[in-house]
A protein has these predicted regions:
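An acidic, glycine-/histidine-flanked metal-binding catalytic module
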Residues: 2-45, 49-51, 162-252
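Hydrophobic side chains in well-ordered alpha-helices
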Residues: 59, 117-123
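Short, flexible, solvent-exposed loop/turn segments with mixed acidic/basic and small polar residues
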Residues: 91-102
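Residue(s) in the substrate-gating loop at a strand-loop-helix junction
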Residues: 109
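Helix N-cap motif at beta-to-alpha junctions
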Residues: 112-116
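Short Gly/Thr-rich strand-loop-strand
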Residues: 124-159, 163
Length: 252
């Protein structure tokens, strides 16, 4: 990837202001920016996004080295958050300062067990402490799952002065996240952001709980788990039904 060029997006203040322009453009509150202001803001944000490419590559390599050092096999991936996704996050979080967004660049390791997850986290954080001379921030959504049922451990670190998010999760936790993404893709309802009918979210939370109790690597054979998976599969196939769930028919 191309080397980072800080001048391409100006200053962090420019990034912050660009984020505010894009927020105002989406929620149509206050002084609505002109089309040229929006285009200019997007150029700044795209340049800032691109500035995370090299730091993300460095984080990805570091994560792979940790896996090698621990003798672990894992599915490892990386991604730069897409511009539409950045804009959507700025819209959903009205106090979000774009210049401090921690997950523009992110990489992930998916492992067999929670024990392996912890080994990777411990080694990664030890290496980061030596490199940055300060501890990484960590959010443990396994000890305290999100309300949605999401489970994983997130490490917030820095490479080349840029914030990078590293997610470490088990295969069961990854399967749950993929189910949510598949539901969102097939139904057009953003379940990941909390949209959609309560019944679906209740099923997802219960599914997350059941998956957390399973022995890693064993196929799902217990009846409650299979029942939830079947119901979610049906909802995914009938996306138009899920989308209108709970909205009523408009009739008395």
């Amino acid at each position: 990837m191309a080397a980072e060029n800080p001048a391409s997006f100006g200053s962090l203040g420019d990034v912050r202001r660009a984020g505010e322009v894009l927020r105002r453009a989406q929620i149509a509150q206050g002084s609505v920016p002109t089309q040229e202001e929006v285009r200019s803001a997007r150029r700044v944000v795209e340049a800032y996004r691109s500035a995370h490419a090299e730091p993300l590559d460095a984080a990805y390599r570091e994560l792979q080295l940790c896996l090698i050092a621990e003798g672990l096999d894992a599915e490892v991936s990386l991604r730069l958050k897409r511009l539409p996704t950045i804009e959507d996050k700025v819209r959903r979080l009205p106090t979000m300062d774009l210049s401090t967004m921690q997950d523009i660049g992110g990489c992930r390791a998916v492992l067999k067990s929670q024990d392996e997850v912890q080994r990777v986290i411990d080694r990664f954080r030890a290496n980061s402490l030596e490199r940055n001379q300060r501890p990484d921030k960590i959010r443990d959504y396994v000890v305290q799952p999100q309300e949605s049922g999401y489970r994983a451990v997130h490490i917030y670190t820095r490479f080349h002065g840029r914030r990078i998010e590293v997610q470490v999760r088990t295969r069961e936790q990854d399967s749950w996240a993929k189910i949510v993404e598949d539901l969102t893709s097939r139904t057009g309802v953003d379940f990941k952001s909390g949209d959609g009918p309560d019944e679906v979210h209740d099923l997802l939370r219960r599914l997350s709980e059941l998956l957390s109790q399973r022995v890693p690597g064993q196929p799902p054979t217990d009846e409650p788990l299979l029942d939830i998976l079947t119901r979610l599969a049906m909802m995914s196939a009938l996306g138009h039904v899920v989308q209108s769930f709970g909205q009523g028919t408009g009739e008395d």
